[in-house]
Swiss-Prot record, chains A, B:
Listed InterPro entries: Flavin_Rdtase-like_dom, Flavoredoxin, Split_barrel_FMN-bd
Membership in a protein family: Belongs to the flavoredoxin family.
Gene3D superfamilies linked: Electron Transport, Fmn-binding Protein, Chain A
Protein name as it appears in the record: Flavoredoxin
GO molecular function, one term: FMN binding
Keyword Flavoprotein: yes
Highest taxon listed in the record's lineage: Bacteria
Alphabetic keyword roster: Flavoprotein, FMN
Protein's job: Participates in the reduction of hydrogensulfite from hydrogen.
Disulfide bond entries: none
Cofactor(s) essential for the protein: FMN
Length: 194, 194
């Protein structure tokens, strides 16, 4: 038996994305967003949505670029702070002791201490209401060597990405792998005639 | 030291979304997508992206509606199968023994056995390349009573949502809560002068 929860923005899990930008003074800034995801494979594109009232909004509109950092468990409190405080009120990254370098591909900063970052050029902007959705075309992804194996594949146990639960408002690490895509479902596939 | 992984569609984690539609014969169908997320709070909107080659694509274009089911741990193999097989080849839901009812709000089916479903009206369609992104305005969310407490709040331990790791291609349950949003970051906030 199902009960109605009403019309709400609820999906589980969401990523915990730190959006990096340069403001109109050229200062690096960052904010945390959970409204986002992958939206295309070729070209590789992602979405991130944020409110017009944010300090980051103007930077995105002006520079047409952002970096998107995947939050790992060690940066839980830092990412939460980046979602609470505003770049208008001071140097958030400095407060956290985080350092940035300029991306060579897009007009946005890379936060060096975060393990995985997407460098994105904004290709579409959609005003959806309270949030504006920025579709970014991924120009490159950079990852710390420590979260890659010798073949350059990602090591999730090293990356330790965080997931977020909207409305419940909690952050979670990933449990163990419970199955593999395009494999776990094979047991339901029709058996081929012998 | 960071290494370049190239331009790829990578974010961690993604949700595991089962997209419900009616085909041109009025038959219920479902496919699994990981390219999606929340994109606006007011009005509440979500995105889901899929390829033109999918059977579901034509249904979305025709009916301008979909349901989005959050996959829970018990439905891991079912959702993986729904992402492997095509509705062109047979009754996927029937194969899985899953049953549907018609949504009263949008022209799409609700899979009764999945614990949480969003009923969505398509408000924007964006051809991004290999994938087309369908922005859906959430008309209502319905949840099994067993995943709600007496106040109607979601119980994550009962819901057990799955997260997906692109490229690594594994499904994961959520670990324990490691912190609470708008709270864990307080330790970085400037202390107010006494």
């Amino acid at each position: 038996m199902k009960r109605s929860l009403g019309a709400k923005p609820l999906l589980f899990p969401t990523p915990v994305l730190v959006v990096g930008t340069y403001d109109d003074q050229g200062r690096p800034n960052a904010m945390t967003a959970a409204w986002g995801g992958i939206c295309c494979s070729k070209p590789p594109c992602v979405t991130v949505s944020l409110r017009k009232a944010t300090y980051t909004y103007a930077s995105l509109m002006a520079r047409k670029a952002y970096t998107l950092h995947v939050t790992d468990e060690p940066h839980l409190t830092a990412s939460d702070f980046l979602g609470m405080a505003s770049g208008r009120d001071g140097d958030k990254l400095g407060t956290l002791g985080l350092t940035t370098v300029r991306s060579e591909l897009v007009d946005a900063p890379i936060i060096q201490e975060y393990p995985l970052v997407l460098e994105c050029k904004i290709v579409h902007v959609h005003d959806l209401g309270l949030h504006t959705m920025f579709v970014g075309e991924v120009q490159d992804i950079k990852a710390d060597a420590r979260v890659l194996d010798e073949k350059g594949h990602l090591l999730l146990d090293a990356l330790k990405p965080l997931g977020f639960m909207p409305e419940v408002r909690t952050y979670h690490g990933m449990g163990p792998a419970l199955g593999r895509a395009f494999d776990a479902g094979k047991l339901h596939m029709p058996k081929k005639a012998e």
